[in-house]
Amino acid sequence: MKKRTRKKLRALWGLLLVPVVLTGCRIRTTPMGVFAQILEYAGQNNSQASSSHGHGTYHTESQPSSTPIPQMDYDSLDAIGEVQTIMVYLVGSDLESDYGNASLDLDEMETAGVDTAHNNILVYAGGASEWQDRGLSSDECTVLLLTDTGFVPVDTYPAENMGDPLTLSSFLNYGFDFFPADSYSLILWDHGGGPVLGYGVDENFRDLLTLDELSEALEDSVGAHMTKLEWIGFDACLMSSLEVASVLAPYANYMIASQETEPGWGWNYDFLSELSDEVIPGDVMGEYIVDSYMDYGEYVFNIYPNLYSDLTLSCVDLSAYAEAEEALNDYFAELDTSLDVQNYPRLVRNRARVRDFGTYSSDMNYGMVDVLHLLELVGNDSEAAQAATEAVENCIVYSDTNMDNAGGISICYPYQTDTDYRDACIEMLYYLDFAPNYTRFLEDFYAIENGDTLLADREISNAETSVTTQNDGAYDESDITLQLTPEQQANFASGGYYILCKARDEGYITAEEDERADDMYLFIQGSTRVTLDENGFLHAAYKNNAVYMQDQDGLSDIPMILTETDISDTENRYLAHAVLMNYTDNWESQTVKVQIVVSDEYPDGIIRSAIPLDHDDAELQSASKQLIHLDDYETMSLVARCSYVTRDDNGNLLNFFDWEKSGWMMGIDVDLTGDYHTVVQPLDHPENYVCIFFMKDSQGNTSYSEMIPLK
């Protein structure tokens, strides 16, 4: 009996409950995380102006925008630049109140060496419950102007809802009227939730800007001045999409945005040093912004490998957007014509393989997929697909990424998301009048998904299985197989497997401690790395090894609990849920998702990053822009839930996470104050481990195999 481990984890049972108590109702998430809160709040406070009136609800209400009356004598300012005015809409949110990221970016702007004699950097700051620096108040919104000595407050107003389109349009009109220049641009700073949810989370008013509200704000300002912004940039997550481009196209020449979530530090504002006495075209400035963002990210990763983050940033030519939308509209008309119950499963299998975004830092499925990768996998090389690919590529004037299959711009294609989110996407597409044939295709796709059952017998509990073990020179690798019926093969969408440990056989529990010890299992690893061969065999290639933690006290005596998150030929990515704790000064804890990568470069694995998770409600999905530095904490606790084998009324195994909880949890404490690292090594007793396959059919139904011993 491994008493040291078990005793630690009996104590951890209580600690896991602490973060919920400590976090209270703080919003520390991107828009999806707070969306349910926003809706609840808006429903109870209808007096709030211009908040979203339902889940993804789009409306056409409009209020005339006016320019705020200046509160200071502009003659007291030094000469105002007349070349470029860059307006920064800085919604501080929890990124400022909890982490001070907005203040840090203001510092970056000050130290960039901006030519303020010819250029205006104008900031509208608000939307945070607390400002960590700069003497700003959460009760106010402040206009800041960058001078050669730093930012100076120009005007101050009572706190305004930065999720109200009127607030944004008023700020833009303010910039046009009082800081005239040859060229104007806009940076939208904060969280982003993609086209369905929108941009910006005002902590004080619990509101954000949906795409219809963003369009309204731009029409009442940029449109009213009958001009165009040179570029609009999102220093925010998930906003490089065709749907967002459709909103910006009438009002700007270029869009600069990220397909993926951004790390908390966001853009590197050193690019402002490029400003001079001549107007810089948007495509050129876009290249500066993309390069500085990527260069700074790589710089951080080299110093702090465990702050690694996937990075994407693109500059999109909005003048080429209309042609891309038209080409996509033609392609999806063709695809929709061929969509029926026979080829639907093949389409689902390809959709499941498309690069998606936002999944690592969130439990939420945003449905954001790379357009070019989608066309590559689904397009079948038709002329319409090739024309759409070429048109989309023409939109992307410059992009960079450290990810595979991130081409520069996304589209929202929800798959296996909740119905509310899917319906909100459809409603958004209708409001934007975006590629009507694409909207029709999605509706037909979902009609089949929710229609009559395509697979009569989806159970795989009685399927033939086998395990073949061979040594690859380093480890014993098991090829675990499961035979599907012809009907199951035809309707196969995706699959995966779980590796479970027999708690009693591995020595974690005894019959004296729990009379049901023989039925108790620990979840060790989950993966979707399976292949279906031409003979209908589903294969899971599992190297009979596991990832352990090593600290100054030695090697952990149970493996880390991992879920594989990204299928790649070059590396294996896993997530582990953990609790970080400090004891010495102010006692604090932080729940996180830790990313571990195993590759040829890191055969023993490396901790790449940690994302905070603060859930007050299990139904709230959170995606964080912030990365956690493990060295700021003293202890990391990793746990595994122990559950009893549970079956349905027909005797089939349920999903492990629906098994009856035993009340026991096993795991380890890792000392972060000294040296710590991951170690990959073979399982001591693979005969104490089992594999369970799961299979999803084309309509999203899931079934589970019986437990398959590894040896």
Where are the regions that the model predicts?
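Terminal, contiguous helix-loop blocks that mediate binding/assembly
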Residues: S47-A79, P195, Y199-F234, M239-K711
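Structural recognition of the beta-strand scaffold that forms the well-ordered cores
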Residues: T85-L90, N120-A125, Y184-L188, E230-F234, ...
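Bacterial N-terminal signal peptides
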Residues: G14-L22
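N-terminal extension/subdomain marker
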Residues: V34, L39-P180
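Residue-level signal for short, function-critical loop segments
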Residues: G92-S93, G127, D190-G192, Y415-T417
